[in-house]
Amino acid sequence: MFIGHFAPAFLARGISEDAPRLGVLFIGAQLTDWALFTLTLGGIERLRIVPGITAMNPLDLYYMPYTHSLLGTALWAIGFAALIWLGTRSLVAASWAAFVVASHWVLDLLVHRPDLTLAGGAEKYGLGLWNFPIVAIPLELGLLLLAYGFYIARTKGPLLPPLILLAALLLFQALNWFGSEPEHAGASFSATAFLAFGILTVLAFWVQSTRWHKNHVGLAVGSVQR
């Protein structure tokens, strides 16, 4: 899953104005993937390209106990929440941050082949919806669009910035689904992932700077963001 991971970020920010900023939540949504692609550069976690391993994704994620086990994801969520708490002294913000990070494993469980573990052990889990594009594509788009629509409905501000963000999300997802498959999972592959995550995160920070919750009142609500 790719852009579907950002659905919990939109949901959290739409529900609570005390949640971290949208850009921060975008970091949290893909935090374990940021970590995965970083750790693969050092050979600590490992993946490879195996064409046809699933109908939609050629990645064989055969060793990723630190980022994509349930325990590993929980530890990343706790660590991210701790950073948010240190920066905000808000348990609400920290809790939403942890929720967004932890959601990554649950969403991956839906689409991955059995390559996810509970704590890095031999038993692996995954419902494998990547083998069923007729299900996986509407699922990912539906999650993202429903959460995005909820965020827009719960906030106010100019529509152009969030529309640009949505267009970027859909463009990157289309490239992921329908672009040419990578030949190798090396440094350039990780760099491409970092670039996509980075662009989307910058756009999310921009969007948050232009929007505020509808229940937020005051003369300067459009310029004062949490």
Predicted regions and their residues:
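N-terminal membrane-targeting hydrophobic helices
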Residues: M1-R226
